Amino acid sequence: MSNLNLATLDISEHANLPTSSEVLFKAKADKKLSFESIAAAIGRNEVATAAIFYGQAKASEEDIAKLAQVLEIDHAHLESLLSGFPDRGKSVSFPPKDPLIYRLYEIVQNYGYAYKAVMNEKFGDGIMSAISFSTTVEKETDKDGNNWAVVTWRGKWLPYSRF
């Protein structure tokens, strides 16, 4: 795989990331592995795998063992870095400054109430879980050769309780 298409990390740009992020990204870059290939090796979704790298998802014991193997990181060291609970949401300033992340924020800002209205009509009064949740990213090319990002969010519907 070409180095040109690998997500890397400049830790100086992300002061709030955990120490594990620097270790994981360095090993990923050294081995020239994509999130897709790492995810396949550990049996996880590529977005979930990337979330572990950014300290936004909890790695299981099995994840840690497989990551240590595929990235050739000392298991005990990786376990010491990843055994705690993630401090989610802390790693990014708000609003985000990265253009792609800002566009995701902008989508929710512009269409959030429309999503809410349609979901309420389909499911009733409630919320879509970001805990019982999965997401995928696919690449689609149209007949004119234009590339499109297809992002799917799948969250369990949680109706509000009456009390």
Curated annotation (Swiss-Prot):
Keywords from the UniProt entry: Lyase
Keyword Lyase attached: yes
Entry-linked Pfam families: Cyanate_lyase
GO molecular function: cyanate hydratase activity; DNA binding
Keyword Metal-binding included in the entry's annotation: no
Family (UniProt): Belongs to the cyanase family.
Protein name (database record): Cyanate hydratase
Summary of the function given for this chain in its UniProt record: Catalyzes the reaction of cyanate with bicarbonate to produce ammonia and carbon dioxide.
Residues the record marks as active site: R103, E106, S129
Matching PANTHER family: CYANATE HYDRATASE
Known EC number: 4.2.1.104
Any GO BP annotation: cyanate metabolic process
Catalytic activity: cyanate + hydrogencarbonate + 3 H(+) = NH4(+) + 2 CO2
